[in-house]
Regions:
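Cation-handling catalytic/transport regions enriched in His/Asp/Glu
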Residues: 1-218
Length: 218
């Protein structure tokens, strides 16, 4: 059905998962990045020094960035779930900032004036989907990492691959990705589709790992 193809009909929880999943390949799989990171005139590949700088910058202040996303998502939900006309929206944002941010907002802050997502018919009360989709996409990429040893990280087992045994494991998992997350569109509950692919419910473990935030405190 044309009404269920692409992102049509997909619940907001998973609308960004495919696009963010593609970003993980560029961010964390060397072969993928070097297949496209070439000079437009000389066709030379990205210098190794530049690649190493990209890796070092990848998770710079990542924890702060995730907190900022949690802050924006929470502000969005608070304003929509129980808004009272007499309550100052900026006061709501500042209260949330005190709960979540390491450095609370400045008294003169009017961040809502530039937070256009909350006034958008599509993303109003749905800004959280950016971060939640990142959890899902990181978990999905982690399956490929475990099967193909892309970064040397083991993100846990994947369900038994019943696809074509003549193909390498990564390609077989790719077939499953195509048949589930890509192929089923908005035709089924995305949570069930994700579980069909991953063999379990989503986990934030992969996102924390790739963000450099899974360090164990002694």
């Amino acid at each position: 059905d044309a009404f269920l193809h692409g992102t049509n009909g997909i619940e907001w929880d998973a609308v960004e998962i495919v696009s963010q999943f593609m970003e993980f390949w560029v961010d964390y799989d060397r072969e993928t990045l070097f297949s496209m990171a070439r000079h437009y005139e000389t066709n030379k590949t990205l210098p190794e020094e530049s690649y190493q700088k990209l890796l070092r910058a990848q998770n710079f202040r990542k924890g702060t960035n995730i907190l900022a996303q949690v802050f924006l998502a929470t502000v969005d939900l608070r304003l929509h779930e129980g808004f009272k006309e007499e309550r100052d929206p900026d006061a709501v944002a500042k209260d949330v900032g005190k709960e979540i941010l390491i450095h609370p907002s400045l008294p003169e802050s009017r961040m809502l004036c530039s937070f256009s997502h909350i006034f958008n018919g599509a993303y109003g009360a749905g800004y959280y989907s950016y971060l939640w989709s990142e959890v899902l996409s990181a978990d999905a990429f982690g399956a490929f990492d475990s099967v193909g040893n892309l970064t040397g990280s083991n993100m846990g087992p994947v369900p038994t691959l019943t696809e074509d045994n003549s193909l390498p494991p990564v390609e077989r998992l790719g077939r499953r990705w195509s048949q589930t997350l890509l192929g089923q569109g908005g035709g089924r509950d995305p949570d069930k589709v994700f579980q069909d692919f991953r063999g379990r419910k989503p986990s934030a473990k992969a996102l924390l790992h790739y963000s450099g935030l899974d360090l164990k405190v002694a």
